[in-house]
């Protein structure tokens, strides 16, 4: 059970796409997918919301370790699991990576790179809401 929830809704990307996104972090693939062209639906980090077709990324945090919930994710129909160590006895492919948090970022980066639009971030302690509302008004007037 992680505090974070789903991240990346997929347009049904393939297992092969996922392997390519993780290539810099991937150590091994444990278990075979039924088909490399089989597709997943979304990426999640909270085992409580896993649905059939989801990729579950097991993140380790201060309070809990997502690896404790691999069985729950598998039983909920996870398409595959992104893990730092293999959990035996699960009938779902496990993509073993050096660091699951970094792998999570690689998946997000690969997804984001599919789109050729600019991305802007607003950070800081004060004024974020005002700044984003002003940006929205300016951009809406132009587009």
Language-model region placement:
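N-terminal leader/targeting and accessory segments in enzymes
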Residues: 1-106
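Phosphate-binding loop of NTP-binding sites
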Residues: 96, 103-143
């Amino acid at each position: 059970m992680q505090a974070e929830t789903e991240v990346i809704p997929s347009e049904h990307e393939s297992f092969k796409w996922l392997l390519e996104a993780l290539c810099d972090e991937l150590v091994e693939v444990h278990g075979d997918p039924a088909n490399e062209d089989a597709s997943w639906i979304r990426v999640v980090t909270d085992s409580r919301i896993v649905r059939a077709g989801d990729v579950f990324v097991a993140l380790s945090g201060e309070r809990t370790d997502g690896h404790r919930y691999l069985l729950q994710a598998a039983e909920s129909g996870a398409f595959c699991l992104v893990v730092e160590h293999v959990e035996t006895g699960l009938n779902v492919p496990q993509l073993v990576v050096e660091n699951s948090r970094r792998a999570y970022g690689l998946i997000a980066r690969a997804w984001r790179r599919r789109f050729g639009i600019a991305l802007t971030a607003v950070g800081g302690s004060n004024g974020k809401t005002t700044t984003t509302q002003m940006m929205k008004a300016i951009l809406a007037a132009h587009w």
